[in-house]
């Protein structure tokens, strides 16, 4: 018993030493500890800079500056005081570190910001934050972040759409197997498949244009949205601030802008991420070994597909983007929850929104770029596509032949039954459907052997695939 207790004590002491060592290690590393993969693995600097600590700080400074500018226009603040505030409202003067230092005392981020600004402005600091509430600053700064994010999204989406247009045009007439329910259906072209993506992403750009004015809206009517603290010129003050910042002016708010605006933008990002995953999921499925019709670019000289299976060429960029798309979509639920604020507002939304808005935008930007990378270098094996059609033993042309029989006088139900019976025979025996149909009295009395062979050519049953590609690409190119 004593030995057993001694063993337990030794184990406890060892675990205790490990914990202490880990805590000391973290203390030494300080702010260099990184946990989120956004810090070191995912996302571009262009997107991260908008939602970084510094990006948020810089925009909040600009909102505070715009407030004093508006007061100056209305004669409440002198031009000299405004000039001084504008001079110090820069992140290299009023630093984020100084604001954080003050916040450790005040436990209020915007009050810390105003104190740091007043400290730097000297005698002109009397007017800083005049008539404002914290969320006048916060929500207007977030609107600036959203505006800058949307500008970036417009650019990246247009580039992706252009890449899709190029691919659709290049593969306009590349015949391949259409599949429904995971089964062979009828022939299509790879260009048509991509044209569907083209039209979908063009609609995403249209939606972004439509929602932008609603989501780049700030506010400046104070603690409960009455404008009482702003005085008799409250509306004019708010309008001046929004005009100076390049934001939309709201009609009515509480202490915060309506979170329906954020929901709309996050939902749009989730929608786009779904479209990207759908396109890249198609690439991944068509790259399956048993299909092998397309392939993500693989650097055969250097790239490794597996640490043990040396032959592997995996669609890792597409897989990576598909995984991140799921994170973007997951931000929808907390975005809806953030709209459920008590009365004129509470603070339950604040911490969640530091994740939902930034992570959605940064990850969506990342997967748009990755999708563009995959599609711009996508390998398309047209010979394999024809091979896969031929492997269906003519079954994919059953619809074509059925329609031809109807056009030559056979009732539609009768034609369907003739082809259904012949198709089941082909499936059960492994014989080519064309050969079975050639022996059918119902078919051979209508078509010669050559006419029947012509009906089994995949390129004869593409409908208006090419014209659809042309139209989708034309409309999209006009849009971008």
Predicted regions located by residue number:
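Aromatic (phenylalanine/tyrosine) cluster motif
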Residues: 6, 12-14
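A helix-coil-helix interface module used to build multimeric assemblies
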Residues: 28-221, 227-228, 235-240, 249, ...
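Glycine-rich cofactor-pocket loops
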Residues: 169-191, 293-312, 343-352, 376-396
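A conserved active-site cap/scaffold subdomain adjacent to cofactor or substrate pockets
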Residues: 261-293, 303-360
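Long, amphipathic alpha-helical stalk/connector segments used for oligomerization, subunit docking
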Residues: 327-408
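C-terminal alpha-helical interaction appendages
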Residues: 377-442, 470
């Amino acid at each position: 018993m004593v030995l057993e207790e001694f063993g337990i004590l030794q184990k406890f002491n060892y675990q205790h030493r490990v914990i202490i060592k880990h805590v000391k290690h973290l203390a030494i590393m300080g702010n260099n500890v990184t946990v989120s993969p956004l810090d070191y693995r995912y996302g571009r600097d262009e997107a991260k800079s908008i939602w970084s600590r510094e990006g948020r700080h810089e925009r909040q400074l600009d909102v505070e500056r715009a407030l004093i500018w508006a007061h100056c226009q209305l004669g409440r603040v002198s031009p000299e005081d405004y000039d001084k505030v504008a001079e110090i409202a820069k992140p290299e003067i009023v630093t984020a570190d100084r604001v954080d230092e003050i916040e450790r005392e005040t436990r209020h981020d915007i009050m810390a910001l105003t104190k740091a600004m007043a400290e730097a402005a000297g005698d002109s600091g009397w007017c800083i934050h005049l008539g404002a509430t914290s969320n006048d600053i916060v929500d207007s700064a977030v609107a600036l972040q959203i505006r800058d994010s949307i500008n970036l999204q417009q650019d990246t989406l247009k580039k992706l759409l252009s890449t899709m247009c190029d691919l659709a045009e290049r593969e306009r007439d590349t015949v391949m197997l259409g599949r429904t329910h995971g089964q062979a259906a009828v022939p299509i072209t790879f260009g048509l498949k991509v044209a569907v993506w083209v039209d979908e992403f063009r609609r995403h750009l249209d939606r972004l244009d439509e929602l932008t004015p609603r989501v780049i809206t700030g506010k400046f009517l104070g603690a409960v949205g009455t404008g009482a603290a702003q005085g008799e010129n409250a509306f004019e003050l708010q309008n001046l601030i929004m005009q100076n910042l390049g934001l939309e002016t709201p009609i009515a708010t509480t202490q915060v802008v309506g979170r329906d605006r954020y929901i709309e933008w996050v939902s749009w990002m989730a929608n786009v991420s779904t479209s990207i995953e759908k396109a890249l999921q198609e690439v991944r499925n068509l790259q399956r070994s048993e299909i092998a019709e397309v392939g993500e670019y693989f650097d055969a000289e250097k790239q490794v597909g597996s640490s043990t299976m040396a032959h592997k060429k995996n669609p890792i960029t597409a897989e990576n983007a598909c995984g991140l798309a799921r994170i973007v979509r997951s931000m929808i639920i907390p975005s809806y929850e953030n709209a459920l604020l008590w009365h004129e507002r509470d603070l339950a939304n604040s911490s969640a929104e530091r994740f939902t808005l930034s992570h959605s935008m940064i990850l969506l930007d990342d997967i748009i770029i990755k999708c563009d990378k995959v599609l711009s270098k996508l390998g398309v094996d047209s010979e394999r596509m024809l091979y896969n059609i031929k492997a269906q033993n003519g079954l994919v042309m059953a619809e074509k032949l059925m329609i031809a029989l109807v056009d030559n006088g056979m009732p539609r139900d009768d034609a369907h039954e003739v082809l259904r019976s012949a198709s089941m025979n082909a499936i059960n025996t492994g014989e080519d459907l064309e050969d079975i149909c050639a022996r059918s009295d119902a078919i051979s009395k209508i078509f010669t052997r050559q006419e029947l062979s012509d009906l089994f050519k995949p390129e004869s049953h593409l409908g208006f695939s090419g014209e659809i590609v042309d139209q989708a690409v034309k409309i999209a190119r006009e849009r971008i």
